[in-house]
């Protein structure tokens, strides 16, 4: 029986003084271990999603942690019959998730995590506004019941949406979510930096929530878009048959 392919997604907001210096070291170990996918590096941290054997993706993760020394790191592993990535890329970026907001220190300044087990009860409270921080094409195929869709084409448009909807957000508890946690974590940092106090986000994102809860209360509706060859996953995290042929993004 063939071994399942492990798909490891990870990120951490951590100060990296010279991120370019890490690229050759990460490329070397990932190539040696036949790992495919993408790792983004910047001065604000790292963001990666890569696939291979369980042992080998964890060896790449260990090297990434050794080189960056984060205070905490978010890690999620799923499995697939096939590699969801065709190539290996390690890239230097200005931001590990592009928002185009200067001087945002997510490592020090962010909202509170809500664990998967507490998410359903939290987002159904009367004084909580739930915001999907993903792009409109992602929201279109699945989202949480009653979540607000900002209808953004890219994450860079999210700050403008926040400023345009001050009346909607003011005085509310704001709960945000995204695929794996990184965009909603950065979104909480944005809101905290401009004066919002009660800001929360789903720890580990939609994928962790679906694994932990199996969507037992049916608050998640539809499928979850993912940025690899699977295109989308069902609420049991199996690849979507309906969206397998969607064009790559």
UniProtKB/Swiss-Prot annotation:
Keywords, in A-Z order: Oxidoreductase, tRNA processing
- What is the reaction catalyzed? uridine(34) in tRNA + AH2 + O2 = 5-hydroxyuridine(34) in tRNA + A + H2O
Q: Where is the active site?
A: 178 (cysteine persulfide intermediate)
Residue ranges annotated for the Rhodanese domain, each copy included: 124-218
In its keyword annotation, does this UniProt entry include Zinc-finger? no
Query: GO biological process annotations for this chain's record?
Result: tRNA modification
Stated EC number for the protein is: 1.14.-.-
InterPro entries from the entry? Rhodanese-like_dom, Rhodanese-like_dom_sf, TrhO, TRHO_N
HAMAP family (UniProt xref): TrhO
Family according to the record = Belongs to the TrhO family.
What is the name of this protein? tRNA uridine(34) hydroxylase
């Amino acid at each position: 029986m063939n071994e399942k392919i492990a798909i490891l997604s990870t990120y951490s907001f951590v100060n990296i003084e010279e991120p370019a210096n890490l690229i050759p070291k990460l490329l070397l170990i990932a190539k040696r271990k036949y790992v495919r996918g993408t790792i983004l590096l910047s001065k604000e941290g790292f963001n990666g999603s890569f696939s291979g054997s369980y042992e080998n993706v964890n060896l790449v993760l260990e090297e990434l942690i050794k080189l960056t020394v984060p205070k905490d790191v978010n890690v999620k592993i799923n499995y697939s019959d096939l590699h969801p990535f065709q190539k290996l890329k390690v890239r230097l970026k200005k931001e590990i998730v592009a928002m185009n907001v200067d001087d945002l220190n997510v490592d020090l300044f962010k909202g509170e995590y809500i664990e998967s087990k507490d998410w359903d009860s939290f987002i159904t409270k009367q004084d909580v506004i739930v915001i999907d921080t993903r792009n409109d094409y992602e929201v279109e195929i699945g989202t949480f019941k009653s979540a607000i869709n900002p209808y953004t084409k890219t994450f860079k448009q999210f700050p403008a949406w926040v400023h345009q909807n001050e009346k909607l957000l003011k005085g509310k508890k704001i709960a945000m979510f995204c695929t794996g946690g990184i965009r909603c974590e950065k979104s909480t940092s944005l809101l905290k930096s401009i004066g919002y106090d009660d800001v929360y986000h789903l720890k580990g994102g939609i994928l962790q929530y679906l694994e932990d809860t199996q969507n037992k209360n049916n608050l998640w509706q539809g499928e979850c878009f993912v940025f690899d060859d699977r295109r989308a996953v069902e609420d049991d995290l199996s690849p979507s048959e309906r969206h397998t042929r969607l064009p790559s993004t």
